[in-house]
Amino acid sequence: MSKHKVPPAYGGQAVVEGVMFGGKHHYVTAIRRTDGSIDFFKLPRKHNPKLNIVKKIPFLRGIAAIIEASANGTKHLNFSSERYGLDPSEDETLEQEEKKSSGLSMYLSLAVIGVLSFLFSKFVFTLVPVFLAELTRPIFSLNTAQIAIESLFKLILLLGYIYFLSMTPLIKRVFQYHGAEHKVINCYEQNLPITVENVQNQSRLHYRCGSSFILFTIIVGMFVYLLVPTDPLWLRVIDRVALIPVVLGISFEVLQLTNKVRDIPGLKLLGYPGLWLQLLTTKEPKDEQVEVAIESFNELLRLEALSEQNQKPSHNVI
């Protein structure tokens, strides 16, 4: 990337047949319906005062970011999975059902579901490699060897899981929208007009991607686990579970660091492992998928501009 002042950072994620983008004040999802139209799901960003305090504390802000992303991501995934294959004539019925279950309770339930889903997957990818590595102890008994083998099993499980997911038609399209999301962000950060042609000319990889974060948890975990014993097995399992927040917190800081130094020769290499993983989690999007991502991002920019304008103090002219 060229050296320039980067505009305000926006994040996003791919959903079923669409893309969600989040800003300081709003979240916007755009999806392509079966009739070819583009539908939007817009929500104001809820700022929890306590969570906002935590988000300013290094190593803890990563946990807060995961909680927030889990809550909002689940809502937008639900919208996309429910709407993309639904006939537009059925929208009103679905909206009435959604209103009955809206409110704080729905937000909290989605947050819990999102966090629990993340933790479950983290437990699986954390504990299964522990037991697999333990099987090799008769041959590799040293602490460092056990940790290295455990990390290798984690990487194999992760890559295998992503590869088999990508073979399904639905997830392949989600990965294409993931690529479209990155391309739009890269185009925006290059200060280029956000057109289909300009967006398609951008890389489908990005330093701030959550895929990179997942890979960093494996790398960071390998070093953190060197500080604790690997024997006996029961203590090793407890250590791995107890250290999940620590690994997540450090990994988030590493992700932020790689994004900050991405324009510095030599240091930008720190982010390469995450970019390599994105070669699996993103695919080159089609023009119509890029159009959806652009519509989502432009709508977010419009809402963000309105919010910023409304927050400016008015001056009465006398």
Swiss-Prot record:
<protein>
    <recommendedName>
        <fullName>Uncharacterized protein YqhQ</fullName>
    </recommendedName>
</protein>
<dbReference type="Pfam" id="PF07136">
    <property type="entry name" value="DUF1385"/>
</dbReference>
<feature type="transmembrane region" description="Helical">
    <location>
        <begin position="209"/>
        <end position="229"/>
    </location>
</feature>
<dbReference type="GO" id="GO:0005886">
    <property type="term" value="C:plasma membrane"/>
</dbReference>
<keyword id="KW-0812">Transmembrane</keyword>
<dbReference type="InterPro" id="IPR010787">
    <property type="entry name" value="DUF1385"/>
</dbReference>
<keyword id="KW-0472">Membrane</keyword>
<feature type="transmembrane region" description="Helical">
    <location>
        <begin position="112"/>
        <end position="132"/>
    </location>
</feature>
<keyword id="KW-1003">Cell membrane</keyword>
<feature type="transmembrane region" description="Helical">
    <location>
        <begin position="237"/>
        <end position="257"/>
    </location>
</feature>
<keyword id="KW-1133">Transmembrane helix</keyword>
<feature type="transmembrane region" description="Helical">
    <location>
        <begin position="147"/>
        <end position="167"/>
    </location>
</feature>
